[in-house]
Amino acid sequence: MGARGTGGVPPTRAAGAAEFRIDLVRTQGQFILDGQRFDVENNNWLVGNDEEVLVIDAAHEAGPIIEAIDDRRVVAIVCTHGHNDHINAALDVHGFVGRVPIALHDDDRMLWNQIYVARGPDLPLKDGQTFEVGGATLGVFHTPGHSPGGVCLYLESEGVLFSGDTLFKGGPGATGRSFSDFPTIIDSIRTKLLTLPPEAVVHPGHGDSTTIGEEAPHLEEWIARGH
């Protein structure tokens, strides 16, 4: 069963005519790659206000995500990368909300195709791309390493980064499987994420939230540790 929570989400604020908010929906399932299966709990983030919302990842169970969407207009379903545990509810959510784009970076299309053969994503994500929702703007950072097409989304007005599986509390995402590379993820984190303000809150695709300031001092430790 999915669960809703705040996960350290900042307080809501007024944005235009409706109150801006960030919702967290946790869902459970399996991550499957290279013939292995792992039980996981995913963070699905919904960003917007009472009128419209952007869905960041749609994992495992569409029902709790749809419940959190409620009657809001969905701007897009953005997949931070193509691993099954971040996209396997995307089509079911899409089927409920109607004609909205499912967005994924082209470099992760081969991962998408492992799950969905007959239908591709609608919108290719690109570095520097932006999404407007609830009076706020989210910018896309291409952060390869965990997968070739991994992305993060930065909500600058709130000082919030949605990091997918690129950065977690305690270090970078795993790079010991197909299509991943440790030096690449370190470069992504160093050049794209650790340059953000130290107070920026990091909401990852799994586990607890953190801040850039909490993680930045440990970069050399991560490099020494390796993947």
Model regions: which residues?
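Metallo-beta-lactamase
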Residues: V53, G139, P148-H227
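Short polar/charged helix/loop
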Residues: R4, V9, R109-Q114, F182, ...
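An N-terminally biased module of ancient metal coordination in phosphate/nucleic-acid-related enzymes
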Residues: G7-G8, R13, D70, C79
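Conserved beta-strand hairpin/beta-sheet module of binuclear metal-dependent hydrolase folds
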Residues: E19-R72, C152-G164
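Active-site HxH/HxHxD metal-binding segment of metal-dependent hydrolases
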Residues: D39-V40, V53, H60-T137, P217-R225
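Short acidic-hydrophobic surface loop/beta-edge motif
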Residues: A15, V25-T27, V47, D127-V133
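Active-site neighborhood of phospho(di)ester-bond hydrolases with catalytic His/Asp-centered motifs
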Residues: V55-D57, V75-H83, I102-H105, H142-G145, ...
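Divalent metal-coordination and catalytic microenvironments
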Residues: V47, D57, H81, V93, ...
